[in-house]
Amino acid sequence: MNLFVDGAVVAGSTSCTFTLSANTADAASKTDLGDGMWDNPEFQNYGWQMGNESFVANVAGLQTLLQKVINGNAEVDVHFQVGDDVSMSGRAIITQLQVSAPNGEKATLSLSLEGCTPLSGNAGQMDVAKAKISPIKGKAMMLAMQVSNTYHTFAASTSHSLTVSVQTAETTTKDDNDMGTYKEVTGKSISLNTENLVSVKNSPSQVTGITFAEMLAKVMAGETLKLAFGYYGSSIGAEAGDDADWNAAETVLVSGDFVCTNLSANGANKENATYSAEFSGKGMPSVGETEN
């Protein structure tokens, strides 16, 4: 079972899903057996969804997907096949793209797709290229904040994530004779998340990145924050508390203005104090560059 996006199988795929949903209308009437108390669904048309989980192995490919979702109409050509028996193709909207980058694990990419045209069956089999991939470590993908015109990473980070969501609406009309449904994009949103150990700057000269105290002050002041999420590669600091140089990032994935919508801290006995912050984007973000 494999999912292809724009003619290529999703690299590093670990799981893919396909769902076909029938849209029905209740045709129950008083003259039915049982005096019309039993549902009598009649098929109207169908909708379909696909999903894929994979390791992040190609930063350039990830950036291309982000450009399609953020700068474009989020539509892609998809092909789904199961062995030699099932082969379906169609046009779909990426309704959610999520990148998770936890420390000590591989970075992962999750895609949710919603069909925006009817499916075409018997589309022919596509070759699945077999190749060994090198998944990117979660540690190599970081979130940074602009402070005094310079981007700084968050101190003692343990995980970061990026989520782009797309809202759709059905546009199927009486003129459409197909059994499937048509959809279009009506809205988009982006969010970022960081999870960290609570760290303290013991002296003004100590370099530890953005701390919980600094975040708390910014949230209470209602500041709009400039954030950037990207791939550092081997340039990331060896210690979790290092304040890595954002300019050394090999690839900036997204950047823009954000507001912190949730800041929470947890101080359990016998465990490290931790905090997490969630950010919602203000307007359209940039792909591949930082905003000053």
Report the location of each language-model feature.
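Solvent-exposed edge beta-strands and adjacent loop segments
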Residues: 1-56, 87-117, 121-123, 131-203, ...
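Short, charged, solvent-exposed linker or helix-capping segments at domain edges/interfaces
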Residues: 64-65, 121-130, 205-209, 288-292
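Generic alpha-helical secondary structure signal
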Residues: 155, 186, 235-236, 279
